[in-house]
């Protein structure tokens, strides 16, 4: 699993749409994200189909339930061949540890990372809606340390928190960043965004990009441009 490739978020309405989309890349091995929209519309078989087509799959369902339920869900997803899974760090250490137990024999090939704070969460929303009276970066840092203590491979975080997380967890703890927008793109419903190159220079280990690729007039060209910007930032 090469997590240094930009991960394409397949926020599409059906398995057919997803497979047609990846088919436009002429056999190129992609890393794609299956989130709630596609998974709930197409069912588990979409993960299997994407794997059979030669792609790595990030199954981003943000598991958050009692430990035994999350353990069972992680087991099911790992058997589908998912390379990367997400759980909510807010579920607690026991729940995160249970997700790893659920991997069984797939623990060598499937990694679990934790959601810290969604990139749509603003500092104001953290305080007024979640009633968390600490700076957003401190909340993210706390969740990252908790996830590492539970044995997870990394976290999902914005580029703005990536360097801070690396400072408390070490460089090998993954920092997977959504909310990526090429220069000049619309921000949409994201609150904390960055360009691919900026995310690399700010310490992200991997990036997730959806609409700037899937909604582009030429998705293949858009993907390659984002990949080039990302790689240039990583080498800088």
UniProtKB/Swiss-Prot annotation:
UniProt-listed Pfam families: OMPdecase
Pathway as given in its UniProt record: Pyrimidine metabolism; UMP biosynthesis via de novo pathway; UMP from orotate: step 2/2
Cellular component GO terms held in the UniProt record: cytosol
Family: Belongs to the OMP decarboxylase family. Type 1 subfamily.
A GO BP entry: 'de novo' UMP biosynthetic process
CDD domains documented for this protein: OMP_decarboxylase_like (cd04725)
Record-annotated membrane-spanning stretches: none
Name under which the protein is recorded: Orotidine 5'-phosphate decarboxylase
Gene encoding the protein: pyrF
Keywords, comma-separated and alphabetical: Decarboxylase, Lyase, Pyrimidine biosynthesis
Keyword Transcription regulation: no
Origin species: Cutibacterium acnes (strain DSM 16379 / KPA171202) (Propionibacterium acnes)
Cross-referenced PANTHER family: OROTIDINE 5'-PHOSPHATE DECARBOXYLASE (PTHR32119:SF2)
């Amino acid at each position: 699993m090469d997590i240094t490739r930009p991960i394409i978020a397949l926020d599409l309405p059906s398995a057919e749409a997803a497979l047609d989309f990846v088919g436009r890349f002429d056999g190129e091995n992609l890393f794609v994200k299956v989130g709630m929209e596609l998974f709930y519309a197409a069912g588990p078989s979409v993960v299997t189909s994407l794997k059979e087509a030669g792609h790595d799959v990030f199954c981003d369902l943000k598991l958050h339930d009692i430990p035994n339920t999350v353990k069972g869900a992680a087991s099911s997803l790992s058997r589908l061949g998912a390379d990367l899974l997400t759980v909510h760090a807010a579920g607690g250490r026991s729940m995160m540890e249970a997700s790893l137990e659920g991997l069984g024999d797939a623990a060598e090939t499937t990694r679990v990372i934790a959601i810290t704070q969604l990139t749509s969460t603003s500092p104001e929303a953290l305080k007024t809606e979640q009633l968390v009276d600490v700076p957003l970066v401190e909340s993210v840092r706390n969740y990252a340390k908790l996830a590492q203590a539970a044995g997870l491979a990394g976290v999902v975080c914005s580029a703005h928190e990536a360097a801070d997380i690396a400072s408390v967890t070490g460089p090998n703890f993954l920092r997977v960043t959504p909310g990526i927008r090429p220069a000049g793109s619309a921000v949409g419903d994201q609150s904390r965004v960055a360009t691919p190159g900026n995310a690399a220079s700010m310490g992200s280990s991997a990036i997730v990009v959806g609409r700037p690729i899937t909604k582009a007039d030429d998705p293949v060209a858009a993907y390659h441009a984002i990949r080039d910007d990302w790689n240039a930032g990583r080498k800088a």
